[in-house]
A protein has these predicted regions:
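Low-complexity, intrinsically disordered or signal/transmembrane-proximal segments
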Residues: 14-20
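Short intrinsically disordered, low-complexity coil segments enriched in acidic
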Residues: 1-4, 158
Length: 171
């Protein structure tokens, strides 16, 4: 797995080596946590504490997830400085996606109902996308939205590298 500039993403390899998480209180004890065993998408940027992945959803180009590396369920499970650090990454991703994709609106969501592993969805929205004004998990409103800007994973990766602080790890 390559994160950026041809470097092996050691963070993903560490995450990939985990196989099971006991997710107490979520009805998933002993089941596999998808975000502990997979990257959750194409890795665009990674640090020791979190990673940014591109979600493969042709209806929502630019849809990214910011995934906390350690298996925790809620924002309140983090220390205040960790929360701030995670949100700084979420806001950086939002800034880059807005700049590159020029959506009508951005949605930020942290649900975790199906995957109780702390992660944020950063979703560009257009007035004519499949679900607008519903959330992307809601009822489909239309079948054929107009084409939206095509931006490569490499372009997103480079823009994220510039947006996030140079002292942050990139792979």
């Amino acid at each position: 797995m390559v994160c950026s500039e041809g470097m092996t993403c050691s963070i993903f390899l560490q995450v990939q080596s985990l196989q099971y998480c006991d997710i107490l209180g979520a009805g998933m004890t002993g089941k596999i946590c998808e975000l502990c065993t997979t990257a959750g998408g194409t890795v665009l940027w990674a640090s020791p504490t979190c990673r940014v992945v591109l979600v493969d959803d042709p209806s929502y180009p630019g849809f990214c997830r910011v995934v906390w590396t350690a298996h925790v369920r809620e924002m309140s499970d983090l220390e205040p400085a960790q929360r701030q650090s995670l949100m700084n990454v979420v806001f950086a991703v939002e800034t880059v996606v807005r700049s590159l994709f020029t959506p009508d609106k951005m949605n930020l969501a942290s649900l975790g109902n199906l995957t109780p592993h702390l992660h944020w969805h950063v979703i560009p929205r257009w007035h004519d996308d499949r679900h607008f004004p519903e959330p992307i998990w809601g009822n489909v409103q239309r079948d054929a939205p107009r084409p939206h800007p095509a931006v490569s994973a490499d372009t997103l990766r480079q823009a994220l590298g510039k947006q996030l602080h140079p002292d942050e790890h990139q792979g």
